[in-house]
């Protein structure tokens, strides 16, 4: 069937909400994804009308990709790690800089099954947002999912 998705219904419902609400505001989004590997962009593009909202997405799984594609400082990654609010915010700022979006969202995390630490166990995910309206304060959140 043409309308079925391989993505979970809950994810599609959230993506629909993102598309509808941002479309109503006339707002364009850019994504900088690491641990999700493009899944957020895939979910958004499942929604009719997403082309009015999604400007572009960057999948920067490796530290090198974060540095080369988004301009994240190697020193920032060395100091705080790839899974940190500082790095995620730099990813969001880089996505904003390299796009025509009004808002950029970045996601980085420890997907597992290996790679976790006592401070950042497997399942730790960091979200950050940057806006083009001149906001200069980091807006991010770290969660254990």
For each feature predicted by the language model, list its residue ranges:
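Short alpha-helical segments enriched in small residues
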Residues: 1-145
């Amino acid at each position: 069937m043409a309308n079925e998705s391989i993505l979970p219904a809950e994810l599609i419902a959230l993506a629909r909400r993102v598309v509808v609400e941002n479309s109503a505001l006339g707002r364009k989004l850019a994504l900088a994804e690491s641990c999700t590997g493009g899944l957020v962009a895939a979910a958004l593009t499942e929604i009719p009308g997403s082309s009015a909202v999604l400007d572009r997405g960057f999948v920067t799984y490796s530290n090198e990709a974060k540095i080369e594609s988004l301009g994240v400082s190697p020193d920032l990654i060395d100091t705080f790690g790839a899974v940190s609010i500082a790095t995620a915010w730099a990813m969001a700022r880089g996505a904003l800089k390299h796009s025509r979006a009004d808002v950029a969202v970045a996601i980085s995390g420890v997907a597992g099954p290996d790679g976790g630490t006592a401070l950042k166990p497997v399942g730790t995910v960091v979200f950050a947002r940057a806006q083009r309206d001149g906001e200069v304060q980091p807006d991010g959140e770290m969660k254990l999912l």
